[in-house]
Amino acid sequence: VIINGFCINTKFLYTIKFYIQFNNTILILLFMFEGKKILITGGTGSLGQALTQRLLDMEVETIRIFSRNEHKQIEMESKFQDERLRFFIGDVRDQQRLEMALEDIDIVFHAAALKHVPKIEYNPFEAIKTNVIGTQNVIDACLKNNVEKAVCIGTDKAVSPLNTYGSTKLLMEKLFVTANNYVDPEKHKSKFISVRYGNVFGSSGSVVPLFIEQIKKKKNR
């Protein structure tokens, strides 16, 4: 490409364009979360902790970690040692506790879910109570507290699901997306968003560690 008489490599231009777009996205995120009060359901999980770390790097006012794992909360509190962190012991199955935890919250990240596929296959209704009914509880609590935005952490397993886990995650996403249909803009400012990810390295429910172990065994043969 010729610009002002200079020949510039096209790949270089694409790199510069990507760099500018990436940094603009970072700036948008920084302003989006600045001064916000955030709650993360399932916040003691691997994804919840990674999200917490990223949010703490921004100028958030406070982050509430909502989970039923008391031991992990203690570990997480010791790990981060940040006065902006608050910890709530609770379960998404408990509507009343959710409503209390979401008081004055601006943004919710809903990461709480049962996700170990074999266990869920033998305990399907438990998965429904947490992943489906629990998600509806989160939606209702968000509406009651007039939360600005709620983000459901979905999964690629929800695409043409082959097991109970994928099916419940698909229902989670559908509940979040359809929640926007019955939100009265005159009464509620809440917006519900669903995002998807694949197998997360380091996640307790990820298949990645299994793949690594299989590769190691194959090498040792």
Task: Please give the residue ranges for each predicted region.
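Conserved glycine-rich Rossmann-like NAD(P)H-binding loop of the short-chain dehydrogenase/reductase
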Residues: V60-K72
